[in-house]
């Protein structure tokens, strides 16, 4: 159907009590409405002037009766169209047969057009927005290309580095090319990568000439590389990415915070020697494991040991601005205290290991109240948490989040879970992962 300037479509159903053909229906429509209204609404004149369109008839003959569906397009206004529709219902004969006509619907074709326009405009706009390049994306793309161009190569090993490594008085040693790119995004250009756990000779020589900061991932791989650097290079400061994160996956704010919190090697080992001790000798005399442990964020603390005169204050590493003078002890005394503490820790952890083993792979929690062990699902535990004032111990076969710590920090001194994923830990609370308990 060619709608043209059509505003409305009149849908009509006709039933004739005998056999009729299509031309009989068309003839009845024009013949029985002729002269019924004024000349302005005569169907023949309206069709000649184009104010109504071509009348379509869909006819079926079934069991001696004829059924027709008639559509009549109209570009008249709504009043004239309504009059015209009502006129069609006055038809009572088609050829020799009696007939009844009923208007089923008058459709405003402009509503359909508006709906089509709305849907099509939405589709076009969505396509435009998908194809449009955001200004921020353009800026970042240009910056990224410049940063990539800024990456240079250092030494015979062609190690990726920032443009200022050669001329800067200080350098930052990282693990790989992606870490160099990440620090370039933060505006740090004096970075060089070791590209693996085997430290190249050019890095060893460079660290002897410049103030060097080792900045490694906060995972097991980062620990291994840090140990290698401490053994082979002249490291002045040590910084670690947040626990469980890689340098390349760390935000600019976190990177700057980690670098500001870097720990001098002298401070790490200063608690195990007097002021006249040579730093390089101390580094060589202390295992890399001890140094790595001292700069790794304390995501758990060991259980309390019997009260003894402290060899040194554990908070020296944690707080850069507060340095407590160590109490001078002989080497023999230090070894004795450590041995005593280790035996006490083993005794206290033996019961904890049994509890951890009992809930592994169950999804349950176990807690100790007044010396009595209780096991629940986590949902049941949360339902009854208001009834529990104090617990001696809490373990859960699930990761420990910050929400769990905030809920339980004033109810128990020890929390054990599959993993520890917290950003803030109260001073009086100890957090352990399953791996740390079993190890």
Swiss-Prot record:
Residue ranges crossing the lipid bilayer per the database entry: none
One GO MF term attached to the UniProt entry: poly(A) binding
Subunit and partners: Forms a ternary complex with MCM helicase and DNA.
Cofactor binding, note field: Binds two Mg(2+) per subunit.
GO CC field: cytoplasm; DNA-directed RNA polymerase complex; exosome (RNase complex); primosome complex
Keywords attached to this entry: DNA replication, DNA-directed RNA polymerase, Magnesium, Metal-binding, Nucleotidyltransferase, Primosome, Transcription, Transferase
Cofactor: Mg(2+)
UniProt-listed SUPFAM superfamilies: DNA primase core
Protein role: RNA polymerase that catalyzes the synthesis of short RNA molecules used as primers for DNA polymerase during DNA replication.
Assigned EC number: 2.7.7.101
Root EC class: transferase
UniProt keyword annotation of Nucleotidyltransferase present: yes
Protein name: DNA primase DnaG
Residues annotated as domain Toprim: 169-243
Domain of life of the source: Archaea
Record family assignment: Belongs to the archaeal DnaG primase family.
GO BP terms in the entry: DNA replication, synthesis of primer
Pfam families in alphabetical order: Toprim_4
Organism expressing this protein natively: Methanococcus maripaludis (strain C7 / ATCC BAA-1331)
Binding site for Mg(2+) 1: 175, 217
Residue numbers binding Mg(2+) 2: 217, 219
Catalytic activity: ssDNA + n NTP = ssDNA/pppN(pN)n-1 hybrid + (n-1) diphosphate
HAMAP family documented for this protein: DNA_primase_DnaG_arc
């Amino acid at each position: 159907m060619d709608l043209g300037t059509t505003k409305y479509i009149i849908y009509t159903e006709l039933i004739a009590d005998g056999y009729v053909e299509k031309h009989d229906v068309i003839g009845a429509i024009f013949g029985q409405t002729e002269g019924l209204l004024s000349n302005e609404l005569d169907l023949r004149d309206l069709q000649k002037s184009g104010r109504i369109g071509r009348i379509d008839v869909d006819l079926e003959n079934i069991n001696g009766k004829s059924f027709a569906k008639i559509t009549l397009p109209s570009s008249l206004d709504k009043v004239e169209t309504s009059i015209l529709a009502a006129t069609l219902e006055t038809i009572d004969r088609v050829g020799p047969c009696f007939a009844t006509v009923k208007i089923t619907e008058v459709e405003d074709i402009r509503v359909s057009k508006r709906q089509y326009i709305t849907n099509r405009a939405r589709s076009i706009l969505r396509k435009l927005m998908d194809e449009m390049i955001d200004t921020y994306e353009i800026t970042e793309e240009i910056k990224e290309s410049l940063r990539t161009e800024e990456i240079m190569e250092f030494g015979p090993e062609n190690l990726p580095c920032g443009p200022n490594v050669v001329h800067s008085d200080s350098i930052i040693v990282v693990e790989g090319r992606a870490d160099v790119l990440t620090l370039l995004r933060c505006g740090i250009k004096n970075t060089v990568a070791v590209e693996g756990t085997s430290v190249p000779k050019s890095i060893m020589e460079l660290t002897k000439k410049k103030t060097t900061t080792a900045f490694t991932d906060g995972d097991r791989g980062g620990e291994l590389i840090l140990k290698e650097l401490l053994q082979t290079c002249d490291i002045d400061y040590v910084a670690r990415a947040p626990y469980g994160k890689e340098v390349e996956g760390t935000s600019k704010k976190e990177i700057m915070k980690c670098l500001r919190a870097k720990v001098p090697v002298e401070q790490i080992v200063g608690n195990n020697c007097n002021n006249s001790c040579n730093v390089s000798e101390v580094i060589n005399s202390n295992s890399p494991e001890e140094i790595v442990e001292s700069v790794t964020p304390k995501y758990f603390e060991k259980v309390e040991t019997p009260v003894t005169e402290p060899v040194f204050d554990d908070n020296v590493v944690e707080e850069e601005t507060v340095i407590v003078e160590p109490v001078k002890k002989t080497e023999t005394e230090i070894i004795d205290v450590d041995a005593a503490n280790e035996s006490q820790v083993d005794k206290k952890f033996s019961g904890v290991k049994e509890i951890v083993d009992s809930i592994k792979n169950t999804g349950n929690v176990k807690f100790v109240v007044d010396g009595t062990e209780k096991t629940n699902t986590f949902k049941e535990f949360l339902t009854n948490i208001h009834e529990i004032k104090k617990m001696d111990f809490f373990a859960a076969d699930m990761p420990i989040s910050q929400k769990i710590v905030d809920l339980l920090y004033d109810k128990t001194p020890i929390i054990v879970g599959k993993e520890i994923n917290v950003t803030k830990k109260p001073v009086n609370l100890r957090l352990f992962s399953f791996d740390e308990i079993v190890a």
